[in-house]
A protein has these predicted regions:
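N-terminal leader/linker segments that initiate helical-solenoid repeat arrays
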Residues: 48-52, 60-135, 139-141, 147-148, ...
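Residue-level detector of the short coil/turn that links helix A to helix B
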Residues: 106, 141, 176, 213, ...
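Catalytic glycan-binding domains that act on GlcNAc-containing polysaccharides
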Residues: 382, 396, 405, 438, ...
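Residue at a conserved register position within TPR or TPR-like alpha-solenoid repeats
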Residues: 102, 137, 172, 209, ...
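TPR repeat positional signature
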Residues: 95, 130, 165, 202, ...
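Short solvent-exposed coil/turn linkers within tandem alpha-helical repeat scaffolds
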Residues: 117-126, 140, 153-162, 188-200, ...
């Protein structure tokens, strides 16, 4: 609800597109990077075959796929077969578990089911029930009831033995039984020295009771505990807390640097999630830069890059160990920092040092943008010869330069080469789509159909193929070819089921999915999953914690396991995204999941496609945070609940504390002035837009208002939510359109056009994922 045009996205290359921390945005986007998708993710990947196969086989229907995938690998050994059996057993156990089916229920509602299981026959189900029920009791302040459930559980519940002891100590401490808690923490550190639960025990052992509820530092109970925590668990979030605390407590002394440097170095490597991370990074560079190693500088560069301080990242990467990524980012950072000459030099150095690296192709494309036209053409010609996969884009850039040099014939020849020699490239798709649109605008539908067919046939997976396929259907209808139109619309849904144009195609197939003028009142059947599925990677403890729904504990465990965030595997990145969603880091979690699409190597693409084919991928990409709040107010306002959910997802990525650069606040990005006006309309003066309850109440009222303004036409209502009713009224009066699709194409604000497509595309994804009837229709195609 910003009512202003968004700035265009900044172009970004694959080497830049490591999962990037995005603290806030005018219009956050999980599907699109902050920079161009022409340069895809080139992460150095470690193979992680077995955990991936766990995710692939998330149901009994797909267990057979485990064997198929294993047998396509290079060595299907006896050990592999044993691993396969163990993974299948784990999958089947999770699917059969009654306890794990209670994860999404409120604690009070599941207690009656858990108690008899906890008192029943010995086994994994009883252990899970005892642990879950004990944790619920502790959360409710009933630690006295929790302790009997935990007694002896560590001996049988092997996946979470260390966490059982941690829960025991937590309950004992809550009951003011500190000596007993200390004894249990010490038992935990001795019995499970490598467990992430031990990190939490060490933190508690080093924390004096008087300091637990205060930020004021006091003398630690056991100084060696925190030293052990920092040494043995440097990546654990509690280690980062201790590092910051010790930095704050440093006394000025001659040897301060000897103490501060290792703490700051640890923060640089592992403290990215801490709110004061950037200040610590700046302090490390400013005060101790001369003591940093090339490896340290790579970590510093990564930290600056993730926090979108690209100029500083470029300077840091210039001092890092030379790799294709570090040299590319050094150059790109210099470029982003306005240091054109230095950027050119680093791009050229990248070309000389790593002449065959994928990063070099992207570097040469960027280099051409910085050079005079004649030099740029030479650079592009070099790139075309050496990097065939980037040749289409290089030729397109070459054609633009030739146009600027008043050489239209040469430019035309370059574009012809794109179509003939690089027919499946994104550049070729753009040319064909422009030609199709131009011919359709001139009512030359035969030619438009021909160009659209060429695009869909040559580049069926290109991002333009869904749009081209939809308009192919529309244009064949104009040519009185209903069978061809139906085939085109169905193909869009089959090939691009997640796209906005799949929804538009479903409309033209007469599916009951709600159109622009009916979707407000449309009430779909919503069926949410009752249980979680195994993650593609992670320890047995992590899997168990996640399946139990213990999100924060699982996240802490993952932080201790995931120590290579600069080079995540496909499975690690997906796991990281899912676990972030669990702890409410929704903006970054959605980004991590969606950016898996940027992988480039054949192995990574295969892994991504395997994950993408599972419901858990799409459920992570289109989640239901705040379900009772959002669905409740949607019902109160007589709004389609999935439309409201999709709008919230687009506005804020479900990040309740987000603020835009123009001041829009919260889940539904309500402007303060708009909030004041709404408060007058509904008679509520006591409100806080930062609070989800007030924000969604106000936001849904405004969405209802925009619907009433336009006779419940959701296209105009959603466009008004973004651009303002005045702008939309003006477009309706001025634009020459005969149907809703033409209106969308003519929206003059690029942000609003993209917003409309994203909201309704999101609505369609929620519908196809959570309405069984629609899912069945898609599966039947």
């Amino acid at each position: 609800m910003k009512h202003s045009a968004e700035q265009p996205p900044i172009e970004q290359s694959p080497a830049e597109q490591l999962p990037v921390k995005q603290p806030s945005a005018e219009q956050p986007s999980a599907e699109q990077p902050s920079e161009s998708t022409r340069e895809r993710n080139m992460l150095k990947t470690l193979r992680n075959r077995w955990p991936l196969i766990v995710l692939v086989a998330i149901s009994t229907l797909s267990i057979g796929l485990v064997v198929a995938l294993l047998k396509t690998t290079d060595a299907f050994t006896t050990a592999d077969q044993s691993a396969e059996r163990r993974e299948i057993e784990a999958i089947q156990s999770a699917e059969r578990s009654t306890v794990l089916g209670l994860v999404n229920l409120p604690e009070a509602e599941r207690a009656a089911t858990l108690l008899p299981i906890a008192q029943g026959a010995a086994g994994l189900e009883r252990d899970r029930a005892r642990y879950m029920l004990a944790t619920d009791y502790i959360n409710q302040g009933n630690s006295e009831q929790a302790l009997p459930l935990l007694d002896g559980l560590a001996d049988s519940y092997q996946p979470l033995s260390s966490y059982v002891l941690l829960k025991q100590a937590q309950a004992q401490a809550a009951l003011d039984q500190r000596p007993a808690a200390i004894k249990t923490w010490n038992q935990l550190t001795r019995s499970y020295p490598e467990s992430a639960a031990t990190a939490e025990a060490l933190y508690q052992l080093g924390l004096p009771p008087v300091a637990k509820e205060s930020s004021t530092a006091g003398p630690v109970a056991d100084p060696s505990a925190w030293a052990a925590l920092l040494e043995r668990f440097p990546a654990h979030p509690l280690s980062i807390q201790v590092a910051f605390r010790q930095l704050d407590n440093l006394q000025p002394a001659a040897d301060e640097g000897a103490t501060a440097l290792p703490l700051l170095r640890n923060i640089a490597y592992y403290g990215l999630e801490h709110p004061q991370y950037l200040q610590a990074l700046n302090r490390l560079v400013d005060q101790y830069g001369s003591a940093l190693t090339p490896e340290d500088w790579a970590a510093v560069g990564f930290g600056y890059w993730e926090t979108q301080n690209y100029a500083e990242a470029g300077d840091a990467y210039a001092k890092a160990t030379g790799t294709p990524t570090s040299q590319y980012r050094a150059a790109r950072g210099k470029e982003r920092g306005g240091k054109r000459k230095e950027a050119i030099a680093y791009y050229k150095q990248l070309n000389l040092t790593f002449p065959t690296a994928p990063e070099t192709a992207n570097g040469l494309l960027n280099l051409a943008d910085l050079q005079p036209n004649e030099e740029a053409i030479a650079t592009l010609d070099n790139l075309i010869t050496r990097f065939p996969d980037s040749a289409g884009e290089a030729l397109a850039k070459r054609a633009e330069i030739l146009d600027a040099l008043k050489s239209p014939d040469s430019a035309k020849q370059a574009r012809a080469s794109i179509l003939s020699q690089h027919s499946d490239s994104a550049a070729a798709a753009k040319i064909r789509f422009r030609q199709a649109e131009a011919n359709a605008a001139a009512s030359n539908y035969g030619a438009a159909i021909s160009w659209a067919k060429q695009l869909v046939d040559a580049a069926p997976n290109d991002e333009l193929a869904a749009e081209a396929g939809f308009w192919l259907g529309r244009w064949t209808l104009k040519q009185n070819q209903p069978d061809a139109a139906r085939q085109a619309f169905e193909q869009v849904i089959i090939n691009h089921p997640e796209s906005y144009y799949a929804w538009r195609s479903a409309i033209y197939l007469d599916w009951n999915v709600g159109n622009f003028d009916t979707v407000r009142a449309f009430q779909p059947e919503i069926e949410l999953p009752s249980r979680r599925t195994l993650l593609p990677t992670g320890s047995e403890a992590l899997q168990e914690l996640y399946l139990l729904g213990h999100n924060q504990t699982a996240w802490n465990q993952w932080q201790n396991e995931f120590i290579t965030p600069q080079t995540p595997t496909v499975g690690q990145q997906f796991t990281d995204g899912v676990l972030r969603l669990g702890v409410g880091d929704n903006l970054e979690g959605l980004f991590m999941v969606s950016s898996l699409a940027w992988r480039e190597s054949p192995e990574e693409i295969a892994e991504y496609e395997a994950i993408k084919n599972q419901p858990s991928f799409w459920q992570a990409l289109y989640p239901f945070p705040f379900p009772e709040l959002i669905l409740g107010w949607a019902q109160e306002r007589a709004l389609n609940p999935l439309l409201v959910t999709a709008l919230v997802r687009q506005e804020s990525r479900f990040q309740a504390d987000i603020r835009s650069v123009v001041g829009a606040v919260g889940l539904m990005q309500v402007m303060p002035a708009t909030g004041e006006w709404i408060s007058d309309q509904i008679g509520q003066t006591d409100y806080t837009l930062d609070q989800p309850a007030d924000n969604v109440k106000f936001g849904t009222w405004y969405l209802d208002f925009t619907h009433r303004e336009y006779d419940n036409n959701s296209l105009f209502a959603v466009a008004s939510y973004n651009a303002g009713p005045g702008a939309v009224a003006q477009w309706i009066a001025e634009k020459d359109f005969t149907n809703a699709d033409e209106f969308v194409e003519q929206i003059p604000y690029p942000e609003t056009k993209g917003y409309v497509e994203s909201v309704f595309g999101g609505y369609w994804n929620y519908l196809r994922l959570y309405d069984p009837a629609i899912a069945a229709k898609i599966n039947a195609l």
